[in-house]
Design a protein with these regions (language model features):
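NAD(P)-binding Rossmann-fold cofactor-contacting core
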Residues: 1-8
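Conserved SAM-binding strand-loop segment of SAM-dependent methyltransferases
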Residues: 9-17
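Short, Asp-centered acidic motifs that coordinate Mg2+ and/or phosphate
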Residues: 12, 27-28, 108
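Structural detector of well-ordered beta-strand residues that form the stable sheet scaffold
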Residues: 14, 53, 78-80, 110, ...
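Beta-strand-loop-alpha-helix segment that lines the small-molecule cofactor/substrate pocket
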Residues: 21, 28-35, 39-86
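Predominantly a Rossmann-like dinucleotide-binding segment in NAD(P)-dependent oxidoreductases
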Residues: 85-156, 163
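Contiguous beta-strand/loop segments that form the cofactor/metal-binding neighborhood of enzyme cores
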Residues: 142-208
């Protein structure tokens, strides 16, 4: 750590995560460790009063996420998922277009993201929470959440798996209580168009 810090000009380096969270000069911690360790490291930071930006996926399942949020609420410590697409200028542009009514009432979205990543060991290792969904499927799911919200009534999904058991590619349909639908695909086998489409009663919008 000291060698890396010296090479890249960092003022400090730490020998452990415990040493990091114990430093009173640290104001916020960005968690970018492998997926299965997010919950452990998030709790460590929260218990030491450190605000957290946690890389996606926030945790590997809903149970873990609820535990982290409950602890953050109890300790009154800020934490959020560091998914950068939520903070792009295009997010506001899309929101403004929808709010203007230019494309009418939103009835559905489709989104996909895929890369050829089948040779990356981390992506196919179940012990590291590998698979297309948790690595790249997060982004089209986030797109659906930003546009349609989270009031999902029904979920349908299917996937093709690697020999290791994690998903190689998947397709998800979300049905919302207001009648809208989202169709989402992600893949660790092939590249895709990598765009999202929003369908309204007066037109549609393409987000690339």
């Amino acid at each position: 750590a000291q060698k890396f810090a010296k090479e890249w000009g960092f003022e400090k380096a730490y020998g452990s995560y415990e040493e990091l969270v114990s430093d009173p000069e640290v104001e916020l911690i960005y968690i970018a460790t492998p997926h299965p360790f997010h919950i452990e490291h998030a709790k460590l930071c929260i218990n030491h009063g450190k605000p957290v930006l946690c890389e996606k996926p926030f945790t590997v399942n809903a149970v873990g996420a609820k535990e982290v949020f409950a602890l953050a609420k109890e300790k009154e410590v800020f934490i959020t998922e560091a998914i950068w697409t939520r903070y792009l200028p295009s997010r506001k542009i899309i929101g403004d277009i929808i709010a203007s009514g230019e494309i009418g009432e939103i009835k559905g979205i489709s989104a996909n993201l895929g890369y050829d990543m089948h040779t990356k060991e981390r992506l196919i290792d179940p012990k590291l929470a590998g698979g297309a969904l948790l690595d790249v499927g997060i982004y089209p799911l986030n797109f659906a959440s930003m546009v349609l919200g989270d009031d999902v009534e029904e979920t349908l999904s299917s996937c093709v798996k690697f020999d290791s058991g994690v998903d190689a590619q998947n397709s998800i349909i979300l049905k919302y209580k207001n009648g809208s639908m989202a169709s989402i695909q992600s893949s660790a086998l092939t590249g895709t168009e990598q765009y999202g489409m929003i369908y309204g009663t007066k037109g549609y919008l393409i987000a690339e």
